[in-house]
């Protein structure tokens, strides 16, 4: 499965909360853990950001991940949809529209996220 990851630009610039330089996302894809457990074979074809606030570039970035990068599934990085919530993008709404339009799964989550010993995101409650 050819997958692409889209992350919050602000979080990437500030220093990814899942470890610097998005280490947790890349580690999860390489280990086929977290949200990538679902794939027998997985290949990362692109990693990009949402395009920054106020989020107007997000839909076009998702479309480019499919058309230009050849992604067969797009993963929304944990930093993009978990707390703090993006004040500009309603991810449930826009991703539902994009999945219908592009006929491609959009998966919420990348790596398992643990904060202070409590599992916050297991990537099991995806909206694909």
From Swiss-Prot:
Family: To M.jannaschii MJ0766.
Protein name stated in the entry: Uncharacterized protein MJ0582
Organism: Methanocaldococcus jannaschii (strain ATCC 43067 / DSM 2661 / JAL-1 / JCM 10045 / NBRC 100440)
């Amino acid at each position: 499965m050819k997958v692409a990851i889209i992350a919050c630009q602000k979080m990437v610039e500030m220093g990814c909360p899942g470890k610097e330089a998005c280490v947790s996302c890349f580690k999860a894809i390489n280990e086929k853990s977290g949200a990538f457990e679902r794939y027998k074979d997985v290949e990362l074809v692109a990693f990009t950001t949402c395009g920054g606030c106020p989020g107007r570039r997000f839909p076009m970035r998702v479309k480019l991940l499919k058309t230009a990068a050849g992604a067969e599934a797009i993963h929304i990085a944990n930093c993009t949809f978990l707390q703090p919530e993006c004040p500009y993008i309603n991810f449930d709404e826009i991703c539902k529209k994009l999945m219908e339009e592009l006929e491609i799964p959009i998966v919420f989550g990348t790596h398992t996220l643990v904060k202070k010993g409590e599992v916050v995101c297991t990537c099991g409650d995806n909206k694909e």
